[in-house]
């Protein structure tokens, strides 16, 4: 059970992210190596030369299915500090011309991620090092931040040799910190103005914004990145050069709209505000965000309600008067007994995962009224109702050109 009283008035907090692991990729060929394995363009990090910048990425299999997601940043120790000599050749201790990156990943797949990076090392002059024990990762959740510039606290943290960066997926996820172990006590003192919360709170907020993370939600080797909104979370550069698994992602993007996407959902509770009530900054990104509660009533009132099991089918209907009737080939088919109705279709809507009544669901886009989410009705197989929440990336989705050509 989660303590509702502890969440009702939270506007900002700091969260130690203990479920993250860090891999350093360093050497003359570090950029080349990572550039050939990731969905995003790391040249932007190299050209920017700022440790205030990070990039969201996916690492793919050769068939284009996602292995794991990551946040990659420049190694502050190398780019702004005094890098330790790393020998790339016998007798060499010259660090000139070296690049060094920190790859931030889900701890549960550290071993697999290390193996994947080493598998394609070939003759690249790089070292791949687990540096998890050297750092602590923190997130500052605060909807009012749009940049880390001109903030005295963050300037001081940088003097403490911390990497301070906006979360690259969306500004609503606030600020990420990479804190060297020998600076942890000092940094915790500087962050004392923020209430410290457990990582469960971070994950609850992240899920409510429609942001998947980690192997539990991304299902290693099984999913198409764009169905999990990599394009809407700044995780793909469609104009970079070739990389492992590129063909499927590029073809899905350039052929047309995908049919399914991940959406945030919450167990429905009556007599709370409309699901279409959003932060103005989500509706219109040009407007500055207001200081507001991290968790609105529609989430607080649903906490601790039982959500559907992972990978269970959902029944989804768009009740908008303007919504065209589905073609008969797409109509759901009921299977099973009358007492236990299961609904399936060619592209099944399903609940992916959740915590405390909030979760992620894979839904057919044609069933979602993205301009008025209240017109989307969702039930699980036991007829419990779920509400589709307004994700942080909704403005990007509504701006996409709706074309009749779609791909699965």
Curated annotation (Swiss-Prot):
GO molecular function: transferase activity
One GO term describing the cellular component: mitochondrial matrix
Record-linked InterPro entries: TrmE/GcvT_dom1, YgfZ/GcvT, YgfZ/GcvT_CS
Annotated TM spans: none
UniProt keyword terms in alphabetical order: Mitochondrion, Transit peptide
Protein localization: Mitochondrion matrix
Transit peptide per record: 1-74
GO biological process, one term: iron-sulfur cluster assembly
Homology family: Belongs to the GcvT family. CAF17/IBA57 subfamily.
Name of the protein: Iron-sulfur cluster assembly factor IBA57 homolog, mitochondrial
Name of the coding gene: caf17
């Amino acid at each position: 059970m989660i303590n509702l009283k502890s969440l009702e008035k939270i506007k900002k907090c700091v969260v130690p992210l203990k479920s993250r692991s860090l891999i350093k990729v360093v050497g003359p060929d570090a950029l080349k190596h990572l550039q050939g394995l990731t969905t995003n363009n790391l040249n932007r990090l190299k050209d920017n030369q700022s440790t205030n910048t990070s990039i969201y990425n996916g690492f793919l299999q050769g068939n284009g299915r996602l292995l794991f997601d990551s946040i990659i940043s420049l190694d502050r120790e190398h780019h702004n500090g005094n890098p330790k000599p790393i020998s790339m050749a016998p007798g060499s201790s010259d660090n000139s011309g070296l690049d060094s990156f920190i790859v931030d990943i889900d701890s549960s797949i550290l071993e697999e991620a290390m193996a994947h990076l080493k598998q394609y090392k070939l003759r690249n002059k790089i070292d791949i090092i687990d540096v998890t024990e050297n750092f602590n990762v923190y997130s500052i959740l605060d909807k009012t931040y749009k940049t880390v510039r001109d903030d005295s606290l963050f300037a001081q943290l940088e003097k403490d040799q911390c990497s301070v960066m906006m979360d690259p997926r969306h500004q609503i996820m606030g600020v990420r910190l990479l804190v060297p172990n020998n600076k942890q006590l000092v940094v915790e003192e500087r962050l004392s103005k923020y209430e410290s919360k457990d990582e469960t709170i971070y994950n609850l907020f992240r899920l409510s914004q429609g942001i998947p993370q980690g192997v539990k939600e991304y299902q290693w080797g099984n999913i198409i990145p764009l169905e999990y909104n990599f394009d809407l979370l700044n995780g793909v550069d469609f104009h970079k050069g070739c990389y492992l698994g590129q063909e499927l992602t590029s073809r899905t993007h350039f052929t047309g709209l995908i049919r399914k996407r991940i959406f945030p959902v919450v167990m429905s509770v009556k007599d709370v505000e409309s699901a279409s009530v959003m932060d103005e900054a989500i509706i219109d990104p040009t407007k500055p965000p207001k200081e507001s509660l991290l968790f609105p009533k529609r989430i607080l009132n649903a906490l601790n309600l039982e959500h559907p099991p992972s990978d269970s089918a959902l029944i989804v209907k768009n009740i908008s008067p303007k919504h065209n009737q589905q073609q008969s080939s797409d109509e759901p088919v009921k299977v099973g007994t009358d007492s236990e109705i299961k609904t399936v279709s060619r592209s099944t809507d399903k609940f992916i995962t959740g915590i405390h009544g909030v979760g992620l669901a894979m839904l057919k886009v044609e069933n979602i009224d993205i301009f008025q989410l209240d017109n989307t009705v969702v039930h699980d197989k036991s007829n419990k109702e779920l509400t589709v929440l307004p994700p942080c990336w909704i403005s990007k989705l509504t701006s996409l050109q709706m074309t009749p050509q779609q791909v699965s």
